[in-house]
């Protein structure tokens, strides 16, 4: 049994317990319902949550992907309903809320859901400028991360990205991890749309790329013409690009040989997590490209993301004149929703000054 299935098997009973009490309180607010019906609903929700993960680990199918999307939307809605209920009960301690007001407050969730779903699927292109003194000539990088190809977003997201990249004036595209989500198997032809991209595409794996098998991800990448940097370096024009593969064994800063730095080139580091920037910068890397955080993906997780990660999203510059860019990613994990963050491709214009 793979990592994703094991995690689902462990979490599903607790998730169902949460859903039972959530549904119970929602129905209490609107008049109540027999607990037997709530139990049936809970079992149904549990099946929708767990069964697609089992089938998708063998072969991805349209019906199981559809159920995964429904489950993801409902997980998001459950969190929103929970906050709604807490708010209603707090206010109700001080004033009596009419039934119509309670109903309106509950209806905010599906209205927000429409916006969140659209936001999660509306791929936008941002542009940022990086000024470097040691840059031989201007060059542009399309930075992507966290595509999360899997049960929530399948081949269409790859086609959409490829089409968008072909409409961007860039020299190179870099994917800083989590090309795959780990919720479905990756088949050899899944990334073939990237073969039609009119620029080199470079990829260094992140944590999710391992969940269903990193070998399948790398094989599909290579078939699609994607350059995989697995603790390897490459030169591209005036750039020396090094990719550090995500390791579950890393404790603190990954070991790097300073000989990887090429003083006559601009040194770019691809590292999925936005960690150790200070150390890598002092070592000589001019630009670090990271993802992983999703910027929190949606409220209220965005607030917690800012607390958990020192560098949650955006472009950062230190006193050495070196940069860290943390993108909020293209895809989504667990739920196909976004609120307060963009599904983005970021064009980084590296300019000499």
Q: How would you describe each model-predicted region?
A:
Residues 63-71, 92-108, 114-145, 150-168, ...:
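N-terminal signal-anchor transmembrane helix
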């Amino acid at each position: 049994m793979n990592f994703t299935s094991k995690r689902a098997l462990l979490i599903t009973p607790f998730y169902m317990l949460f859903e039972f009490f959530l549904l119970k309180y929602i129905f209490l607010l609107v008049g109540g319902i027999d607990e037997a019906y709530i139990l049936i609903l809970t079992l149904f929700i549990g099946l929708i949550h767990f069964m697609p993960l089992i089938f998708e680990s063998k072969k991805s199918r349209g019906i199981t992907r559809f159920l995964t999307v429904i489950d993801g939307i409902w997980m998001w809605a459950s969190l929103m309903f929970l906050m709604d209920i807490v708010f209603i009960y707090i206010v109700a301690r001080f004033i009596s809320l009419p039934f119509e007001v309670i109903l309106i407050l509950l209806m905010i969730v599906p209205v927000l859901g429409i916006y969140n779903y659209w936001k999660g699927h509306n791929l936008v292109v941002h542009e940022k400028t990086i000024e470097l003194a040691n840059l031989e000539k201007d060059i542009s990088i399309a930075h992507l991360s966290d595509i999360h190809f899997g049960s929530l977003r399948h081949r269409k997201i790859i086609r959409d990205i490829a089409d968008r990249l072909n409409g961007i004036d860039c020299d190179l595209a870099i994917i800083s991890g989590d090309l795959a989500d780990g919720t479905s198997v990756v088949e050899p032809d899944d990334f073939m749309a990237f073969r039609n991209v009119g620029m080199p595409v470079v990829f260094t794996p992140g944590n999710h790329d391992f969940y269903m098998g990193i070998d399948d991800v790398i094989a599909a990448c290579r078939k699609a013409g994607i350059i995989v940097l697995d603790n390897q370096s490459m030169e591209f024009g005036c750039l020396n690009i090094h990719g550090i593969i995500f390791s579950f064994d890393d404790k603190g800063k990954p070991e790097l040989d300073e000989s990887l730095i090429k003083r006559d080139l601009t040194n770019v580091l691809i590292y999925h997590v936005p960690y150790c920037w200070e150390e890598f910068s002092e070592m000589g890397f001019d630009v670090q490209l990271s993802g992983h955080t999703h910027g929190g993906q949606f409220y209220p997780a965005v607030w917690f993301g800012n607390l958990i990660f020192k560098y949650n999203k955006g472009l950062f510059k230190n006193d050495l004149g070196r940069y860290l860019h943390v993108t909020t990613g293209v895809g989504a994990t667990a739920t196909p929703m976004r609120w307060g963050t963009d599904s983005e491709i970021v064009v980084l214009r590296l300019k000499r000054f």
